[in-house]
Amino acid sequence: MKKGSLLSGYLEDPSKTVWLILFCFTIAFFIGAAAAGLYTGDADRIIPGFITICSRPSQFTMDYFELGTLGGAFLNTAMVGLACNMMLLVSGAHCNGLTVAAYWLTVGFATFGMTFTNIWPFFFGTWIYSRIKKVKFGTVANLAMFATSMGPFASELMVRYPGLEAHGFTVQGVLAAAALGVFVGCVLPPLIAHVPNLHLGFDLYGAAPASGFLAFFIYCVLYRSPGIEVPTNTYLGDGCRFFVNVFFVSIFLLCIAAGNILERGCHRRYRDLLRHHGHKTDFTTEFGIPVTLINMGIYGLFIMLYYNIVHGMVYDGGSIVFTSAKFTGATMGAIMCMFAFVAQGAQPRTVFPIAVGYALASLLPFFAAYTGLVETQNWNLCTQAILVGMCFASGLAPITGKYGFFAGTAAGAIHATLVMSVPLWHGGFCLYNGGFTAGIVAALMVPVLDRYMGSYEERIAKKELSRKK
């Protein structure tokens, strides 16, 4: 932080500042839970709704607004956030941009797949991993949060497996979930360390490919190989557009204000961040926390704008119908997950082309229905899986930053084409489905782009050479 700026002493320890910012977000969720109860008039159902959320299976896609009320979903999010805050504090973790990502991915899924009960087996498993490797738990705290991507498996073991109907918590189920947590906690860290060789850092959701492959293995062991029937769990309501908009727009405006308060005039340096390619970076160290807060606010408002203006075009019975996005628990979670890598490479300039790619890809199922190739249109931009998929497609932002607008558009279109098919690999039990898909897209695209376009560094060198001539 520059000398003479406001509260200069406050940012002497950036790690503590990042933790405090994340804790403030958690407090905001607690306030949101109380406000939601007043807004919907069912404040007395917040606690029962929270208990219902925690005691039900959480296989993709569960809408916690519908399952446990709006206030109950916010309370679950707040409790998950508080668990993350306390784990980081007690373990003495060094908080940085990756911690911001891990936190937001964890709380993001707390409205449609993560619960206060299904995160603990993975925190415990990662702690066991730290004991085995004889390292401080704080050094792997981020990995503990990423490991919660397997939360639906834990819920399944605790309250339903191997049947199709929930039977409630059992001792055997809790022990099985704990054993799964130890397995995931010990296996996932080395996998996460290896997967950058697959996507070369072009998938911001770097832990997602590792989670996806591991979920595929666990799914086969628990269901496919023994021949156990796979339960289905889609549970969606109509959402709550007004409340979600007011809550997040308020938070994002406060982020912009906080950035300017911590460092006057830092918004001028935000232009430098917008020009950054976003590949293998940490905005908190490269541009400072105040500028990162500005990006949090502006990128967050960009996300809200997208989810408010996006409309799906559907061909139905000889007529064209336009649908709008429902602000369900899953949509709210998508907003938070899309926000996750705001400190590690995501920003409006590099994500916009990916959204364009999604829009172009949506024309394929539309014209398939319009021309009579199929009877029913398979999906549109407002299909819930696509709304969630778009949030994880934003993880391909470094492709835009390194290879340009059209490469980013192509990445978005390919991601939209694949994302609804990938759950067949893991049965809907891996929460990082879209990030897993992004890793596959990056693995397919980057070698081809490098071969035909050259690397970012090579193209910059050519531009510099042409200027000198």
Which functions belong to the PLM regions below?
Residues 2-114, 259-263, 285-294, 301, ...:
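N-terminal signal-anchor module of multipass membrane proteins
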Residues 6-17, 135, 140, 151-245, ...:
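Membrane-interface helix-loop-helix junctions at boundaries between adjacent transmembrane segments
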Residues 66-78, 109-120, 169-183, 317-332, ...:
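Structural signature of hydrophobic alpha-helical transmembrane segments
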Residues 86-98, 111-119, 131-142, 193-204, ...:
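Membrane-helix interface "capping/anchor" motifs
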Residues 89, 103-134, 145, 156, ...:
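Conserved mixed alpha/beta catalytic, RNA-binding, or beta-rich assembly cores of soluble enzyme
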Residues 177-194, 206, 381-456:
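C-terminal transmembrane helix pair
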Residues 235-240, 272-278, 455-469:
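Short, highly charged, low-complexity non-transmembrane loops/tails of multi-pass membrane proteins
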Residues 266-366:
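Transmembrane helical segments that form the transport core of multi-pass membrane transport proteins
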